[in-house]
Amino acid sequence: MKVIFMGTPEFAVPALKKLITHHEVKAVFTQQPKAKGRGLNLAKSPIHQLAFEHQIPVYTPSTLRNDEIINLINKVNADIIVVIAYGFIVPKAILEAKKYGCLNIHPSDLPRHRGAAPLQRTIIEGDRKSSVCIMRMDTGLDTGDILMKEDFDLEERITLEELHNKCANLGAELLIKTLANIDNIVPITQPSDGVTYAHKLTKAEGKINWHESAYKIDCKIRGMNPWPGVYFSYNDKIIKILEAEYLNADHHFTSGTVISDKLEIACGSGILRVKKLQQESKKALNIEEFLRGTNILKDTVLK
């Protein structure tokens, strides 16, 4: 099948690799190179780099909402468009430009976690099951019909990186199965109940509320690493918690109280045992290394 591919980050790479192997990728659309590192050198997106290596024509428009781009897409000899974490809204004229429309890989149990941050919200909300869906896109926000779906259980303390990699690889496999059977698949309309929205994360969400349960805070730590990171302030400095574990233990302490010299912290319910931290502008350290340089005393009440 002849394919136009639209995507940008690492999450989209396994799918493009599979398409290059099994189909004919006629063109790739991705975000423009961005300044990176101290030298602010322009860096191609992971999808741009992969397409470049395979000599596939690459386009980096600043929007899809203009006639020039729509005409360009109409001229590309393709049967279908695949869109994965591209970063731009796809207008109706492009959604309907090819025989089989536009397909999308969405890493959640739709209609749960529609929107920009389904992986993060899955972990933050403490979900124990999830799915990867192949969806035919329409003009709504992740409201299209489901062509193929695979459910799976989540390990209790799965990290964002682990879930990202699992869904990226599973989505790539499902995409190839979908394309192989596309003429025989009966699309399934998403149910109207159970709809939630996975809104984009904000930096403010990362600030710890010690009145929440240790379990909830641990979910946030795993779901918000690396960005925005979960943090507290101590001596007017921001300290991120990169790794922790929660203990379902009863206590009588005020929420936010450091109850041991190993940085165990009383929460609204349960105790958070911190394992890895990073002070602003410094490197990440395990708890032993961190406490050698920053002594947070027992009985301190953190804010």
Swiss-Prot record:
Residues annotated to bind (6S)-5,6,7,8-tetrahydrofolate: S108, D109, L110, P111
Gene3D superfamilies (alphabetical): 3.40.50.12230
Major enzyme class: transferase
GO molecular function: methionyl-tRNA formyltransferase activity
Keyword annotations from UniProtKB, A to Z: Protein biosynthesis, Transferase
InterPro entries per UniProt: Fmt, Formyl_trans_C, Formyl_transf_N, Formyl_transf_N_sf, Formyl_transferase-like_C_sf, Met-tRNA-FMT_C, Met-tRNA-FMT_N
EC number: 2.1.2.9
Domain of life: Bacteria
One Pfam family here: Formyl_trans_C
UniProt keyword Transferase present: yes
Record GO cellular component, one term: cytosol
Catalytic activity: L-methionyl-tRNA(fMet) + (6R)-10-formyltetrahydrofolate = N-formyl-L-methionyl-tRNA(fMet) + (6S)-5,6,7,8-tetrahydrofolate + H(+)
Entry's family note: Belongs to the Fmt family.
Record function comment: Attaches a formyl group to the free amino group of methionyl-tRNA(fMet). The formyl group appears to play a dual role in the initiator identity of N-formylmethionyl-tRNA by promoting its recognition by IF2 and preventing the misappropriation of this tRNA by the elongation apparatus.
Name of the featured protein: Methionyl-tRNA formyltransferase
Species whose genome carries this gene: Rickettsia peacockii (strain Rustic)
UniProt gene name: fmt
